[in-house]
């Protein structure tokens, strides 16, 4: 009996122990000096953190690669890496992700990235694709901004054989200064700086040295970071004598580096396992650590100081930590250009082909129905179009960002998110016939609030407590415009409390704004066609069957009434049974949308990466000539702007895809008023992708 009781007591104690979460972060150190600092870090954290708070344990390995492998094997939890090693950590089988970033500069203006740029003199007259035979200035062999990124991006232009790499680079440029290169084996790499010294004794070494090489006239182009020219030329008039080379073979002033750079390079980053990686615990630990032992916090122990070495555990120049948004994996964190450059150097692979030999455009499709239409398009395009699938629009945008997909057509709200993620609009959907459709992008369509005529007492001013129907969270007519106007009235983001219930696909599943949705099981309230109330037609159907008000485009009611939509729920509907809510509190017939709307919305637009812009433009214009609105019989032929259900890949009422001319950034395309309205609504954003992208491009 005593044994049984004892066993029960032991089990109870063990059970209690097992129930206590492991709050230890095992930090990986790569030298004796790092291990010593890690132990000091551990001991000082013990003195300031409660016993139930996070703690540090130290694991010593021989190298950063060993640390990466140890974390992947759950033998350690965290280590700080530079960008190149973050790439290694991300690769299978390691599958690590960035969780905390070091920042530099000030707390008010934290810098977590720098931009690698190509600087030239203003009067030199050549572009990025004309660098062959020019003289080049590099910060140093093997360094990110000065070598790895530019040479990685130029890799496929280098003369073959491309190994050894130094020889190929020497044969590409007519002369170079690449400090740290072997001047005996590759004399051309040291032609502009005799000796190729690997220290500041070489006047052309490092960022400032590479710029001096350009400034002195020794070289034609300097590969440096964006701040180099500002650090070396205080006078704006002097800076104006220089320009940046852009990847699209244009030039920009040196202060426009955010839109004209070779790659965005992240600061040193703490990585952890993608699954079960303790990322919240690591952040809790480091956030408390910077509060107690950050810059100018403590004399006993300093997190960003290395008395017995340099950059131990963390960079000495760091000012603090920022939490990396959860949506951001390593590929997104590093960025497409950086990953492309490093992959080219490591694997000997080549980036996008030139415009004259465009690779197929990989179109991103949402849902089963879109994929079916895309596959049909792919077959008819004879290899010009390939198809990639994703569950949500944001997943598609992420795939385009990292090169897994190339293009898709988006509502204005998602054009905004895509723009914040570095994508660009390339063609606009036009919805009205005119003689010059492809050359004249339209001003936009109208966002309207539709109600049943029978609900005669309902106005814009008494929507509180009513049942609402939205195209999806983040979309223009269905969310951004009406919720932006509503936010200005109620000054808070609790829209699920303002309406009694609704269907706004993309809302949290337990929200009242999912209660009216009709999707079954996991498809309920999903922002794709698996949710029956998704999109313009879906939101109108929601109004017909359950809701009080639907936020849609001005064409939605006419397109789904009078027998134009043969679906059972719509075939007997009449346009006259619906009215529009006007912002002045009145109502008008559906036909009077020009005088009764919430706002003018930008037309849907095709977006892509900057490097694919020319190819997407070229191929889509070819495709619409083959399969656009000039095809009259869609029963036996593929039609780009027709769908088995509704608005698949493009809006069904699209007449053509039009050139944007100078409206080729998301700000210019959407217009200042719309960008400002969506910017205000960002306070209410639940977009994890937008959070991740603004981390990269604040």
Swiss-Prot record:
Q: Where in the cell is it found?
A: Secreted
- Disulphide bonds annotated for this chain are 28-67, 38-58, 137-213, 156-350, 177-193, 180-196, 190-198, 246-260, 358-615, 364-396, 374-387, 421-693, 437-656, 469-542, 493-684, 503-517, 514-525, 582-596, 634-639
**Gene Ontology terms, cellular component aspect?**
apical plasma membrane; basal plasma membrane; cell surface; clathrin-coated pit; early endosome; endocytic vesicle; extracellular space; HFE-transferrin receptor complex
**Which residues are involved in binding Fe(3+) 2?**
411, 445, 536, 604
Residues with PTM Dimethylated arginine: 42
Keywords, comma-separated and alphabetical: Disulfide bond, Glycoprotein, Ion transport, Iron, Iron transport, Metal-binding, Methylation, Phosphoprotein, Repeat, Secreted, Signal, Transport
Q: Which GO terms describe its molecular function?
A: enzyme binding; ferric iron binding; ferrous iron binding; iron chaperone activity; transferrin receptor binding; transmembrane transporter binding
Q: Which residues bind hydrogencarbonate 1?
A: 139, 143, 145-146
Give the Pfam families listed for this entry: Transferrin (PF00405)
Phosphoserine, modified sites:
389, 685
In UniProt terms, what function does this protein have? Transferrins are iron binding transport proteins which can bind two Fe(3+) ions in association with the binding of an anion, usually bicarbonate. It is responsible for the transport of iron from sites of absorption and heme degradation to those of storage and utilization. Serum transferrin may also have a further role in stimulating cell proliferation.
Protein name, as recorded: Serotransferrin
Which species does this protein come from? Pan troglodytes (Chimpanzee)
